[in-house]
């Protein structure tokens, strides 16, 4: 495992809710990353509880996360160490209520 893959693995395993995104939660740099943040907010997740990684600040992470997850696009959501998907999958799961259950925010 490369140093980059180890860094990613450590982040995934140590974070309850982790989002690899372009930009930051307060200033997303792409529409899909912004949508991912909005979905998490709509689920009732405290923004401070979400660990975000701005892949635009680290090219090794930006490329490495795609290899780590075998998923070609960003954003990427991980919950309790498990890869969930990108913003389209997040939206589908939100609409079905599955994402809220996974995050423990279901009413």
For each feature predicted by the language model, list its residue ranges.
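Acidic beta-strand-to-loop metal/phosphate-binding motif
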Residues: 20, 76-80
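Non-catalytic, surface beta->alpha helical segment in thiol-disulfide oxidoreductase systems
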Residues: 79-107
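N-terminal organelle transit peptides
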Residues: 1-4, 107
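Thiol-based oxidoreductase modules, predominantly thioredoxin-like and allied folds used
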Residues: 45-62
């Amino acid at each position: 495992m490369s140093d980059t893959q180890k860094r990613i693995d450590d982040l995934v395993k140590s974070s309850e809710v982790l989002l690899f995104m372009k930009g930051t939660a307060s200033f997303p740099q792409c529409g899909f990353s912004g949508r991912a943040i909005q979905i998490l907010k709509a689920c009732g997740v405290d923004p401070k509880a979400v660990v975000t990684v701005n892949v635009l600040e680290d090219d090794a992470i930006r490329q490495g996360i795609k290899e780590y997850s075998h998923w070609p696009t960003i954003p990427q959501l991980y919950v309790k160490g498990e890869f969930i998907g990108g913003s389209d999958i997040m939206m589908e799961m939100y609409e079905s209520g599955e994402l809220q259950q996974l995050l423990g925010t279901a009413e």
